From Swiss-Prot:
EGF-like domain mapped to chain residues: 93-128, 130-161, 163-195, 208-243, 245-280, 282-315
Location within or outside the cell: Secreted
One cellular component (GO) term of this entry: extracellular space
Renumbered residue ranges of the record's region May be required for E.coli agglutination activity: 24-33
Species lineage: Eukaryota, Metazoa, Ecdysozoa, Arthropoda, Hexapoda
Listed GO biological process terms: antibacterial innate immune response; defense response to Gram-negative bacterium; detection of lipopolysaccharide
Region forming the signal peptide: 1-23
Name the UniProt record assigns to this protein: Epidermal growth factor-like protein
Length: 317
């Protein structure tokens, strides 16, 4: 083989993925070959007879060329897979094809568009401008709401107003002629503004519907209509009120806070009580020769009697 022809063929076949040899081979008859997908996205390999990819002046040399195909006389070439189109030959690169175009978006897979931020799909599948709101009383152009004649764009840029002397509320829009249009979940009240619709047992609190507990939920929170959930250290009592809990009973007193006992009037804490949950009677003047058994009431020891009726002084009999 002429050396110049050898160099020319080598350059061509490096592009299509074949190698050149001076060995003589007999090409087999053309056969069907299923394209095989390569690891590169959208790039497939196709096996074809070498003679089909040679220029006319070199076809007579086909029998001297050994390809890299699965049979003598065949070679593998790179092509774009179905649904892809070529964008570069060196290096070989294919990109997804969307024949109808994507508008304000990019073709990310065969016939699949991904819209840019602020755009959405139109009826024809292309990406078009989408305004932040419904663009009421206006037209959406380039992701901006252009108001119809006689209407003015609201500061939030979502819709155009035609003049309302009153505020339609957070769930309403002015549609012109002093009329409010309410969004889903809102309804016109007697003042003509939009008010949130709350289910029975709920009330509007700011921008949400919250459950209603008619008696309130002191030391707890209202989690459902008429139902309180107590804070830690509290529990519902028989009156359905969140009352403090004490792990030990409060003798002659009451549980005033979680694990805190408060003595009743006329009683004081028993210094000998380990848990601080026992209260004992208090006698202001003390009980000489006796025991304070109730607030300001003494019982005399054996062999002693009250000095006088109503007295807390005990004397020997």
């Amino acid at each position: 083989m002429d050396f110049k022809i050898f160099l020319f063929l080598t350059a061509i076949f490096m592009i299509v993925g074949v190698t050149v040899s001076t060995a003589t081979t007999n090409p087999t008859a053309p056969r069907a070959y299923r394209p095989r997908i390569n690891t590169t996205a959208g790039v497939c390999e196709l096996e074809v007879p070498i003679v089909n990819i040679l220029p006319p002046e070199l076809k007579h040399t086909a029998h001297t060329i050994r390809g890299n195909g699965s049979a003598p006389g065949f070679s593998k070439i790179k092509i774009c897979c179905s649904g892809y189109k070529i964008v570069a030959h060196t290096p070989f690169h294919c990109t997804p094809d969307c024949p109808s175009g994507c508008g304000l978006g990019n073709c990310t897979a065969p016939n699949v568009c991904t819209c840019n931020k602020g755009a959405g799909f139109g009826p024809d599948g292309k990406c078009i401008s989408v305004c932040p709101g419904r663009c009421l009383n206006g037209q959406c152009y380039g992701n901006f709401c252009n108001c119809n004649s006689g209407f003015v764009l609201e500061p939030n840029g979502r819709y155009c107003t035609g003049g309302c002397t009153r505020n339609c509320g957070p769930g309403g829009q002015c549609v012109g002629n002093n009329q409010c249009s309410c969004l889903s979940g809102f309804a016109l009240n007697s003042q003509g503004t939009c008010q949130m619709i709350c289910a029975p047992g709920f009330q509007q609190m700011g921008s949400a519907c919250e459950p209603l507990c008619p008696k309130g939920c002191v030391n707890g929170e209202c989690v459902a209509p008429g139902q309180c959930r107590c804070k830690s250290g509290y529990a519902l009592n028989s009156s359905k009120v969140c009352a403090p809990k004490c792990s030990q009973p409060c003798y002659n007193g009451f549980c005033s806070a979680p694990n805190v006992c408060t003595c009743k009037e006329g009683y004081i804490k028993d210094a000998t009580s380990r848990n601080g949950n026992r209260c004992i009677a208090y006698c202001a003047a003390g009980c000489p020769n006796g025991t304070c058994s109730a607030p300001n009431f003494c019982i005399c020891k054996q062999g002693y009697i009250k000095q006088s009726k109503g007295s807390n002084v005990c004397v020997k009999q």
